[in-house]
Regions:
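Aromatic-anchored transmembrane helix interface
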Residues: 62-69, 84-110, 120-125, 129
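A membrane-periplasm/extracellular boundary helix in multi-pass inner-membrane enzymes
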Residues: 140, 219, 237-293, 315-319
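A conserved mid-to-late transmembrane alpha helix and its immediate loop/hinge
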Residues: 167, 218, 329-367
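Transmembrane alpha-helices of multi-pass inner-membrane enzymes
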Residues: 185-188, 376-386, 392-434
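Hydrophobic transmembrane alpha-helices and their immediate junctions
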Residues: 242, 347-386, 414-415
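TM-adjacent membrane-interface loops and short helices in multi-pass inner/ER membrane proteins
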Residues: 283, 287, 294-336, 350-352
C-alpha cells in the first residue's frame, strides 16, 4: 500500500510538471509547474551545498545561450512597433522555468529511486499519460468529479464546456495533445530499446496498453495525439525489423513481433467491442479519429478543423521587413491564425523562426551523446516539433529539460574524455543519487 501511495504522489508531481494547472485559491500566474520549479531550485541549491559546488551541464548552458539570443531577437522585433507582445521576448524565463521544474521532478523521484534514469522518467511519463486519460473519462462522465475539478482547478473550463471538449487535469486541446504525442514517442523508444522491457512480457504488455490508452483517449482530448501515435508505431515496427542479424530473422525478433501483434489484436478487439456496445465510447472514437472515419465513409481523409486551418489560417507577411524581422504580433486575435509557422514569421520574422528551430534541433540531437540508442527518438522528436507547428506554436522543451536532468547511459570515462566538455561542466550525469 505504501508503494502505491508513493507512486501515486510521484505521478501527480510529474503530472503537475508535464501538464501545468492553475489553482482557484492561488493567483493564476502561479501554476503547478512553477511550484515544482521552486522545489527544484531548493533541491538544486541543497545538492550544491552537499556537493560543495554548483554545476550546470553543457547542454543546459548552450541551450540557455541559444534561448537568450532568441529572446533578444524577439525583443528587437517588437521594439519600434506599437505591439508590445513579449510572449517570446522573455523565452529565456520560460526555458529556466521548465528546467527548474524538470530538476524538481528529478529530485522528487530521487527521494525514492537510487538512480533516476531514462527508464524511470519514461515509466512515470506513461503513468501520467494514463492518469490523465482516466481522469478525463471520469470528469466527462461523472458530474461530481467534474464539479470537484472545476472548483479547485482553473483550467479555462468555460471554453472547454462551450466546445464540449474532454479534458483532464491540465490536459486539454492542442497543448495536451502534443504532450501526449511526446509521451507516446518515449514509450515507443522504451519498448524498442530497453533491455528490461525486451526481456519481460509484463513490461511489454503494460507499455503497449499504456500506448493504446493514451492513443485512444488522448486523441479524444486532442487529435494532435495521433501524430505521436503514428510516429511511435512506425518506430516500434522499424525497431522490430532492426533486430535482424546478418539479414536473418532471429528467434527473439519473432517472439517480440508475435507478442506485439497478440497484444495489439487484444486491444483492437476490446476497442471494437466497446465501440459497438457503448454509445459514449463510440462518440469518443468517432471524434478522436474523425479523419479516419471520414476516409472510410466518404473517401476523404479530412476533419472540419483541418479544413478551417487550411482554408482560412495561412497568413503571411506582406512586406520584406516583416518577412525578415517580424512585426511583433502573435496569436489568433492579432494575426487571425493559430498556425505556428505563420505566427513565428509574423512575430519575429524568418530569422527568429530559424533561431528557434536551431535551438530545438540542438536540444533534441544533443541527447544522442547522453543516451544509447536514442538516434531515432531524437529525429522523431524533431519531426514532432516541426509537424505540430503546422497547427499551433506549442513546443516540447519539457522533455528535453527532463532528459538534461536524468542520469545518462554512458560511463563516466566517456565524460572525462569528451573533448567538447569543459572541466567543470557535466554532460552525462552518470552519478547516482545519494
Amino acid at each position: 500500500m505504501r508503494k502505491i501511495l508513493v507512486g501515486l504522489v510521484l505521478t501527480v508531481v510529474v503530472s503537475f510538471y508535464v501538464f501545468p494547472i492553475s489553482f482557484t485559491f492561488l493567483p493564476h500566474a502561479i501554476n503547478s509547474k512553477i511550484l515544482v520549479g521552486v522545489f527544484g531550485i531548493v533541491a538544486f541549491i541543497l545538492n550544491g551545498i552537499r556537493e560543495k559546488g554548483i554545476y550546470f551541464s553543457e547542454p543546459t548552458i548552450v541551450g540557455a545561450v541559444m534561448a537568450s539570443l532568441f529572446s533578444v531577437w524577439c525583443l528587437y522585433s517588437i521594439t519600434g512597433t506599437s505591439n508590445y507582445n513579449t510572449i517570446y521576448a522573455d523565452y529565456i524565463v520560460s526555458y529556466a522555468t521548465w528546467l527548474a521544474g524538470a530538476y524538481g521532478v528529478y529530485a522528487a523521484l530521487g527521494l525514492v529511486y537510487e538512480k533516476v534514469d531514462l527508464e524511470i522518467i519514461t515509466r512515470y511519463l506513461a503513468l501520467v499519460g494514463v492518469f490523465q486519460c482516466v481522469t478525463a473519462v471520469l470528469i466527462d462522465n461523472y458530474g461530481g468529479v467534474q464539479s470537484f475539478v472545476d472548483r479547485w482547478m482553473d483550467l479555462d473550463q468555460d471554453f472547454l464546456h462551450r466546445g464540449n471538449r474532454m479534458y483532464g487535469i491540465g490536459a486539454a486541446l492542442d497543448p495536451g495533445g502534443i504532450r501526449f504525442a511526446t509521451i507516446l514517442v518515449m514509450i515507443a523508444h522504451q519498448f524498442s530499446t530497453n533491455l528490461n522491457v525486451r526481456n519481460n512480457s509484463l513490461y511489454q504488455t503494460s507499455d503497449l496498453v499504456a500506448f493504446a490508452t493514451i492513443t485512444i483517449i488522448g486523441s479524444v482530448i486532442s487529435r494532435t495525439t495521433t501524430i505521436g501515435a503514428a510516429l511511435g508505431i512506425a518506430y516500434i515496427i522499424i525497431a522490430l525489423f532492426r533486430m535482424r542479424r546478418g539479414g536473418f530473422v532471429t528467434l527473439r525478433m519473432v517472439r517480440r513481433f508475435f507478442w506485439f501483434i497478440l497484444v495489439m489484436i487484444g486491444i483492437v478487439i476490446a476497442a471494437v467491442y466497446f465501440y459497438r456496445s457503448s454509445e459514449t465510447f463510440k462518440e469518443y472514437v468517432r471524434f478522436g479519429f474523425e479523419a479516419f472515419f471520414n476516409w472510410v465513409e466518404t473517401g476523404e481523409f479530412r476533419t472540419d478543423s483541418t479544413d478551417v486551418l487550411m482554408e482560412r489560417m495561412w497568413k503571411w507577411p506582406s512586406d520584406l521587413h516583416t518577412w525578415v524581422f517580424g512585426q511583433g504580433t502573435f496569436g489568433i486575435y492579432e494575426n487571425n491564425t493559430d498556425i505556428g509557422y505563420c505566427n513565428f514569421t509574423l512575430y519575429c520574422g524568418l530569422v527568429g523562426m530559424v533561431m528557434f528551430s536551431i535551438f530545438f534541433l540542438y536540444c533534441h540531437l544533443v541527447q544522442n551523446r547522453k543516451y544509447k540508442e536514442f538516434q531515432i527518438t531524437s529525429w522523431l522528436l524533431i519531426a514532432l516539433t516541426f509537424i505540430v507547428w503546422v497547427k499551433v506554436t506549442t513546443d516540447i522543451f519539457f522533455i528535453d529539460a527532463l532528459l538534461f536532468c536524468a542520469v545518462g547511459d554512458y560511463e563516466e570515462a566517456t565524460e572525462s574524455t569528451d573533448s567538447l566538455l569543459p572541466k567543470m561542466m557535466q554532460l552525462y550525469n552518470t552519478k547516482q543519487n545519494r
